[in-house]
């Protein structure tokens, strides 16, 4: 039976345990994800408390991380999503995404509405990918793809 969390507390505590195990075992998220059949972004988000994992994936990652049966069950529960505490993020990496939305949010909204009409881009029917590519001017660049289904507003 599908279970749902009503507060972020249990998943936040599990996230701390997961990150500790990942560090102790010197694993990457990619290594933990291997064989789950899920995208790296989805599994990473689940391990950080933002998604539920299917039973087989929960068992696999728990085995890799040395987690108990309680953690396997908790990884399968529907979390309280978007539960980052504190409002405006203070972590520099997360803050840059917040800043990008602050600068380009109205542009994205205007262009989505111009191309699609009144509606939203789903974060439920959604895929995320990040690639590291060389910068022709030196260094590296991050190519981040946000691929969400367009959902039109339906008058009622």
UniProtKB/Swiss-Prot annotation:
One of its GO terms (biological process) is cyanate metabolic process. Keywords: Lyase. GO terms for molecular function: cyanate hydratase activity; DNA binding. SMART domains: Cyanate_lyase. Signal peptide: none annotated. Pfam families: Cyanate_lyase, CYNS_N. InterPro entries: Cyanase, Cyanate_lyase_C, Cyanate_lyase_C_sf, CYNS_N, Lambda_DNA-bd_dom_sf. The active site is at 96, 99, 122. Its EC number is 4.2.1.104. It catalyses: cyanate + hydrogencarbonate + 3 H(+) = NH4(+) + 2 CO2. Catalyzes the reaction of cyanate with bicarbonate to produce ammonia and carbon dioxide. Belongs to the cyanase family. This is Cyanate hydratase. It comes from Burkholderia vietnamiensis (strain G4 / LMG 22486) (Burkholderia cepacia (strain R1808)). The lineage of its organism: Bacteria, Pseudomonadati, Pseudomonadota, Betaproteobacteria, Burkholderiales.
